[in-house]
Amino acid sequence: MKITSTSCICPVLVCLCFVQRCYGTAHHSSIKVMRNQTKHIEGETEVHHRPKRGWVWNQFFVLEEHMGPDPQYVGKLHSNSDKGDGSVKYILTGEGAGTIFIIDDTTGDIHSTKSLDREQKTHYVLHAQAIDRRTNKPLEPESEFIIKVQDINDNAPKFTDGPYIVTVPEMSDMGTSVLQVTATDADDPTYGNSARVVYSILQGQPYFSVDPKTGVIRTALHNMDREAREHYSVVIQAKDMAGQVGGLSGSTTVNITLTDVNDNPPRFPQKHYQLYVPESAQVGSAVGKIKANDADTGSNADMTYSIINGDGMGIFSISTDKETREGILSLKKPLNYEKKKSYTLNIEGANTHLDFRFSHLGPFKDATMLKIIVGDVDEPPLFSMPSYLMEVYENAKIGTVVGTVLAQDPDSTNSLVRYFINYNVEDDRFFNIDANTGTIRTTKVLDREETPWYNITVTASEIDNPDLLSHVTVGIRVLDVNDNPPELAREYDIIVCENSKPGQVIHTISATDKDDFANGPRFNFFLDERLPVNPNFTLKDNEDNTASILTRRRRFSRTVQDVYYLPIMISDGGIPSLSSSSTLTIRVCACERDGRVRTCHAEAFLSSAGLSTGALIAILLCVLILLAIVVLFITLRRSKKEPLIISEEDVRENVVTYDDEGGGEEDTEAFDITALRNPSAAEELKYRRDIRPEVKLTPRHQTSSTLESIDVQEFIKQRLAEADLDPSVPPYDSLQTYAYEGQRSEAGSISSLDSATTQSDQDYHYLGDWGPEFKKLAELYGEIESERTT
């Protein structure tokens, strides 16, 4: 099979030569070579030869972007087996077969049905095969060929980036590289000049230029000044076909900004300035601003201000505001119009960051003169000191002078000044001030231990202008006097072991004093000399504001005495010296041999009784509850009793029932059996409560040993003898007073009752001697007796 290619038409001569070569090759390839085959037929061996392929193939070319109405002819497939009778069928497979490329299966002509773009796909690989139309058997093996898309100049150059934004320092040398731009062309760079790009500048001359081959942009002028022009817009063109007429082109914009360098010194707008400052301006406050201009920007415009000379250098100072680049003039010392009315300052502003490449442009600093006018202001009174410190002793009398403050009018008028205290807190009311002289006095008695320090605020005002006020703080320290005696530092729980030895230290005590250190230490500890010498304990002053308690004798017994009391004296070193007395309580405890406490008297009692602390508390609570019940019961019983004496208006003939059994309290207490069991409890004599005894016996004093040794019989005899000789104990006779009926009683008279006694048995004259209570009874019975007599 042979392939003809009539599509190679550009240039024509080359295509004709190429077609002639193709046909020559096909002619020489028409020789068929048979493939060797071995076949056994009836014992004979038949040799077959494989014929040589009858294909002739090559590359086909097709123009891109074909816009004709008919399919574009690509080429022709032909096989040597094709006799022109239509028995050979051509089949085309591969990339684009049947869609982009179609084949006439009889003639082998190939056509392109679509417009192709080389930039999308440069070539197509296809497969061709010739088969027998009747049997569909291949006449020759399948062959592969390529269809290449022929390039045309249909793509303009394109810049990879853009628009571009770049910077270049101002005052740069001519030819300084700014940026390199690059444009690409999608056409085939190996075919003609379709992809050969040339650069040119359309806008931006004469400031910048571009290299036509590399696309490098450079400065075209020397010393371009940012302050004159800062921004430039440069348009660069890229054109293919080596820039020839008819070539395609693309463009981009490059925005170039000149960056600043320090090529301009600072300049003050004026050479002379004038500033007004009132004399009342506060020290440290800003009184004015000044600024020098710099055409540069950023750090190149940074500057510092300084005072280089002038008569106000010690009065004023200047600093630089880094944000606004202004010089801030501040006051270092107070102004006084009466002393100086104006000042002159020379102020300099200089760049901070210098560029030595431009030092030839001159010094990068400037100076100006500032005149300051001091304004007269009516000022408030001025105290002689910014604050005052005074001292006064505690317990000083009311009206004691503490100190004096002084304020004057600083103006030339020298107005009179008045003083007063701002009573903002309660502490200020301990003092007052003389409005004319400024003398501060006490109004209360001060106590250093309660308040050691006072702070008061004194205000001064002018009489002519009361609105002008000045304030000053007065600190008053209260000095200490020795008015507090020393006392024990705390309550001490001191114990002594039963097995203690003489001279043994059992405890160490210390003292405190509310007074100041100068009037407090040192403390002296001693025993009161007015008391007898304590035989059990002594006191030793350690001369370090402590004292030790020592034993005087050997061994102590809890059964004999379990608690001892030791009175001590403590004095301080103040002038005059003060002292106080205290009593130490010392308990006797049982200790181990190594000195550890085992039990004390309270613990021993509980342990011997077999009771714990919780059990003891429970017993006490039960006893208290029982006592409360008994008291409540007795109170209710007593509230139900009638009064012993009934008033005259409330006498009735009623039968009164008494529920008391036995004797009274005197009878029950006189024969209390506890007196026999504990004779010492009977030492106190019992007296009747309804009368006052006429004679009292002196109490008896007997030793406990005598009472313990006497027996019960002797004790009873002794008490019986005392009762017989004592007129103040029962039995004894006394006059008892009872209620009487009275004249207005609603009850009937008892005279209606007949007496069972005879006349000789009763004598009623004695009733008149019993008093007014029996007067009515005497009258009744006296009349009856007289009637009987008559």
From Swiss-Prot:
Modified residues (Phosphoserine): 786
InterPro entries found in the cross-reference section: Cadherin, Cadherin-like_dom, Cadherin-like_sf, Cadherin_CS, Cadherin_Y-type_LIR, Catenin-bd_sf
Extracellular side: 54-608
GO terms classed as biological process: adherens junction organization; calcium-dependent cell-cell adhesion via plasma membrane cell adhesion molecules; cell migration; cell morphogenesis; cell-cell adhesion mediated by cadherin; cell-cell junction assembly; homophilic cell adhesion via plasma membrane adhesion molecules
GO molecular function terms attached to this record: beta-catenin binding; cadherin binding; calcium ion binding
Domain named Cadherin: residues: 54-159, 160-268, 269-383, 384-486, 487-608
Compartments, as annotated in UniProt: Cell membrane
Domain-level remarks: Three calcium ions are usually bound at the interface of each cadherin domain and rigidify the connections, imparting a strong curvature to the full-length ectodomain.
Protein's UniProt name: Cadherin-18
Gene name in the database record: CDH18
